[in-house]
Amino acid sequence: MAKKQYTIINSSSTLDTYTEYDLIESPAIVSLKNVENKGLICVGSWVEYRTVDNSGNEITCISVQDANTGDVFSGQSATFRESFSDVVDRISDMEETPDMFFIEVLHRTSKSGRDYLICALVSPDRALARMGYTEKNIPMPEPQK
């Protein structure tokens, strides 16, 4: 099988071969559309990249790896990419930039009836409480290597 052709636009860090494969080429990648509304992802690694779809059209995609499970979620939704970029900018402005952060995937419907995706930053305390942890100061998972 030929290597998928793509150009990385932006990423969480310099990606090693395994992480790049997981985020862009792996057949185990799940569509962001399949994440339930308000589903939490503990973002570890992520990448935004350009590739070509089956029709030969250039598309921009984003892939996010859950640091807890290693699962990768990917999609080409412009609204999701824009909201994710806003979250990354917000995280980058923090005094202590975390290696990981929580987002929730939100399914919305436009006034014209079209479905679209966005994401929102979730505080670690709120995310952990939603995951069933009641104690404070629960350590974040180690980043996936």
Predicted region positions:
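Short intrinsically disordered terminal tails
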Residues: 1, 144-145
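OB-fold/S1-family single-stranded nucleic acid-binding modules
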Residues: 104-143
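OB-fold ssDNA-binding interfaces and closely related basic DNA-contact patches used
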Residues: 1-69, 112, 124-126
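Short nucleic-acid-contacting surface segments enriched for D/E, G, S/T with interspersed K/R
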Residues: 82-103
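Short, basic/aromatic beta-hairpin or loop at an interaction surface
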Residues: 67-79
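Hydrophobic beta-strand residues in large extracellular and virion-surface proteins
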Residues: 40-43, 62-64, 98-105, 118-121
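A short, sequence-level motif marking secondary-structure junctions
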Residues: 77-82, 135-137
